[in-house]
Regions:
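Acidic/polar loop patches that form or flank catalytic/metal-binding clefts of enzymes
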Residues: 200-206, 239-241, 305, 309, ...
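Long hydrophobic segments that form regular secondary structure
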Residues: 236-253, 258-268, 272-277, 287, ...
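N-terminal export/assembly segments and adjacent metallocofactor-ligating motifs
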Residues: 1-23, 31, 35, 50-54, ...
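Short, structured coil segments at secondary-structure junctions
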Residues: 330-331, 392, 408-410, 495, ...
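Phosphate/pyrophosphate-binding active-site segments
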Residues: 411-413, 422-483
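A glycine-rich, hydrophobic/aromatic-adjacent loop/helix-cap motif
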Residues: 474-546, 693
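Short, charged, surface-exposed secondary-structure boundary motifs
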Residues: 344-348, 407-409, 423-429, 519, ...
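A cross-kingdom feature strongest in bacterial/archaeal respiratory oxidoreductases
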Residues: 34, 324, 364-367, 376-405, ...
């Protein structure tokens, strides 16, 4: 089909609007309300054009392209209409461009220059709009607002959380939150990007710099397993702000608030500025050479079989590769990145924690089963993809111990106690084994006896509905990242694998860190190096290394609260002969347990590579040179390898390091399936009267995010416990009081009580939002509650 624009013929597809055809062919049409990721509003009228044969101008954004029609974007009628619209928009717009954050990248400035009048005919006073506080992330200046409603539509359509709305009429119209509430969407910062004027600005960078002074540097998000592409805006060797970088395969044009504002942590008070060593019982700052000499001397006298190394799954591929390489060269095989995991049964069975399908294909799935995942806040970009699938009528179900609030609707929310999670999955397998027995392709798969012996012979309606939905074409099962703390994690992976076989579903584990696949590929595991699994030289896993009370511990880019057994770890470190930390940040309490701390550059100050959940290797650039006396991780680890006199093939050049890793690991293929016949079913989760639930707060997931001031102000009321009414009454809790005491072992905490029917029976939900919550005790363990 063909249309004419400005006397030239162009092809178009059915359903295209004129502005879409024009954009594809490089024809400029001004616009404010139109955005290709949002629905059409047609309320700014800036895109008015002439349709030949019609006397009135037409909005190009909402006018459907019609075959054999002719449109003019530069006729006298179109130009006059655009100038008139611009004049109306500028009537009330303040002339504060020199102090506006949007200055230099403002759509209104650009359009006014190209389509505005030279002189204004309006001489009256301009209106002024009150600025409401909508939270710590977005600074408003609503006098500049031109009512394009992009922010309103973003909340409704993309974030799935309707928080902004238009209140009033005419000149009194205001864009604001309902009841003057704060914005809580984990993707709210994207409204700053799509705002065409300076009405919505990033609070941390407000009034601190000009657009033309900034250098744009490509990078990758380091706070979830999606690997969103970002641009760092750098000025004077400081990250000034972070914005999305378009990548349609992964994050499209959006990023989470966690990715956008975490850069604030770079110069936090906990930042390690120089190497630190404990000398004569006191921690003092030393030079790099002195620190390396102390490390060399200490490691020479340590029993390597009684030493262990832990590295963050948020570290780069390069750091992970060099870390395990260095430790194995000095005969330390107790290496692990799985520090938040507590169940390591059958760990040497190959399990590559990747997604079976590309991220971009999630929006096309027909059915989804979420297992204990707070995905809206844990993985905001992935939740957006699922929301797109929901809007295409995908059937979504969840099984969890807490009914999380999603930005999409679900068919079934099956609420189960953590003790019953594996039993629920076995019930699904039992039902599926009956209804798939007539399928010739599935007949060859026999349910393992150690699974079938747990069949009960009864299934409820929710189990049947969830199972039937999965049997449809193109289904997906996702295991939430919080399950890594579950004592039956290995068993749950096996059961999910059986369900995926019976339903021909794709599956995936939502890793809690950005580079778990990198840690797996590079061999940061006790049973494999970067090339092969090697059970003969297998070392201790993280759990065993901590409980073994070893002589030496080396901790890379991890804080103690990142460990599942954090209290046990502290006890082991207190009794160790030597503890080395390679860290960007350290608290005063943690500092006392280290003998040497080397200052590590943050992810913003170092180049590197992350492997996301779909096995996409993504390189990123160094945003700024390391602050203070910190160094890039790959340089520190290369120095440590050279210091021990090993013959190494790697040079000091970063490119050579990339080539070495690429030749060894990049082309290897791995499986994320766990063979169900190899694992026995064991109930590792004890039956407690009360069991503790709760993942990690989305703004407390790693050592950078938890130090970003603005992010930590988002949810000010963090010290709360959630329990349902039935559980409270069974434990004789006074429902008229708003404070209770919770206890785990010898630790106790005074918290605010919230009665919440979304919590499963005999469970207490405490989100880990501060150090006190981590120190209280572990998830999925016994907890008690009592009156104050």
């Amino acid at each position: 089909m063909k249309i004419k624009i400005n006397n030239k013929e162009y092809s178009f597809n059915k359903g295209d609007t004129v502005i879409q055809v024009a954009d594809r062919n490089g024809i400029h049409i001004p616009r404010f309300c139109y955005h290709d990721k949002l629905s059409i509003a047609a309320n700014c009228r800036m895109c008015l054009i002439e349709q030949v044969g019609i006397n009135k101008p037409q909005p190009a954004c909402s006018t459907p392209a019609q075959e054999n029609q002719e449109y003019l974007t530069k006729s006298d009628l179109a130009i006059s209409s655009q100038k008139n619209t611009m004049e109306f928009l500028l009537i009330n717009h303040p002339l504060d461009c020199p102090v506006c954050d949007q200055g230099g990248m403002c759509e209104l400035q650009d359009q006014a220059l190209m389509h505005g009048r030279v002189k204004s005919r309006y001489a009256q006073e301009k209106r002024v709009v009150i600025d409401y506080n909508i939270g710590p992330l977005i600074k408003t200046n609503m006098t500049r607002c031109i009512h394009c409603t992009r922010c309103v539509r973003f909340g409704e359509e993309i974030a799935g959380i309707k928080e902004f709305g238009a209140i009033g009429r005419g000149e009194g119209l205001e864009i604001r939150t309902y009841l003057s509430a704060a914005i809580n969407s984990p993707m709210s910062g994207n409204m700053i990007d799509i705002c065409p004027v300076g009405a919505l600005n990033a609070s941390p960078s407000h009034m601190k710099g000009r657009t033309w002074e900034l250098e744009e540097i490509k990078s990758v998000s380091a706070h979830d397993c999606i690997g969103s592409n970002i641009n760092m805006h750098v000025f004077d060797n400081n990250v000034f702000r972070v914005v999305p970088r378009e990548n349609e395969k992964i994050n499209e044009i959006w990023i989470s608030d966690r990715d956008r504002f975490s850069y604030e942590a770079i110069d936090h008070n906990d930042r390690i500025k120089k190497p630190i060593a404990k000398i004569n019982g006191r921690h003092i700052e030393v030079e790099w050479d002195q620190a390396f000499e102390i490390i060399k001397e200490k490691l020479q006298n340590i029993d390597k079989k009684k030493s262990a190394g832990f590295i963050s799954a948020n570290s780069t591929v390069e750091e992970q590769y060099l870390f395990q390489k260095w430790l194995r060269e000095i005969d330390i095989n107790n290496i692990d990145y799985r520090v938040s995991q507590c169940n390591f049964e059958n760990q040497d069975l190959e399990f590559y924690p990747q997604l079976d399908i590309p991220i971009r294909e999630i929006e096309n799935i027909k059915s989804l089963l979420l297992i204990d995942s707070n995905i809206t806040y844990e993985q905001p970009i992935l939740a957006y993809k699922i929301r797109k699938a929901f809007l295409k009528d995908a059937k979504i179900n969840s099984i969890s111990s807490y009914n999380y609030e999603y930005n999409f609707n679900t068919n079934n929310n099956l609420l189960v106690n953590p003790n019953s999670l594996s039993d629920t999955l076995i019930d699904i397998i039992e039902y599926l084994s009956h209804i798939t027995s007539s399928d010739k392709k599935l007949k060859s798969f026999n349910i393992p006896e150690h699974v079938s012996k747990h069949f009960k012979g009864l299934t409820n309606k929710n189990i049947r509905d969830i199972s039937n939905d999965l049997l449809g074409h193109n289904s997906l099962i996702l295991l939430g990242s919080n399950l890594k703390n579950h004592p039956e994690f290995e068993l749950l992976k096996v059961l999910v694998n059986i369900i995926s076989i019976l339903t021909k579903s794709n599956k995936g584990y939502l890793a809690e860190n950005c580079n778990e696949l990198g840690a797996w590929v590079t061999g940061c595991l006790p049973y494999k190096n970067e090339v092969i699994s090697d059970s003969k030289n297998s070392g201790f896993n993280a759990d065993d290394s901590i409980k073994a009370m070893l002589d030496c511990y080396i901790i890379y880019n991890l804080e103690f609260i990142d460990f599942y057994y954090n209290n046990e770890l502290k006890n082991s470190l207190e009794n160790a002969e030597f503890v080395l930390g390679i860290q960007s940040f350290v608290t005063e309490d943690d500092r006392s347990l280290y003998d040497v701390i080397l200052p590590l550059a943050t992810v913003f100050e170092s180049p590197g590579t992350f492997i996301n959940i779909e096995n996409e290797w993504q390189n990123f650039e160094q945003g700024c040179t390391p602050h203070y006396m910190s160094k890039e991780g790959w340089k520190i680890l290369t120095k440590l390898r050279l210091m021990h006199g090993k013959e190494i093939s790697i040079s000091h050049d970063y490119v050579d390091l990339l080539n070495e890793i690429d030749s060894i690991a990049r082309k290897k293929k791995f499986s994320n399936s766990v063979q169900p016949h190899n694992i026995d079913i064991k109930k590792n989760l004890e039956s407690f009267n009360l069991i503790r639930l709760g993942g990690v707060n989305t703004y407390y997931v790693d050592n950078i995010v938890r130090r970003a001031p603005s992010l930590n102000k988002v949810d000010s009321n963090k010290n709360i416990v959630r329990v349902n009414k039935n559980t409270l009454e069974k434990n004789n809790i006074d429902l008229t009081k708003n404070k209770v005491i919770v206890k785990q072992g010898d630790n106790k905490l005074l918290v605010e009580l919230v009665i919440d029917e979304n919590v499963s029976d005999n469970s207490i939900y405490i989100m880990n939002s501060n150090k006190e919550h981590f120190d209280l005790g572990k998830q999925y363990q016994q907890i008690t509650i009592e009156n104050v």
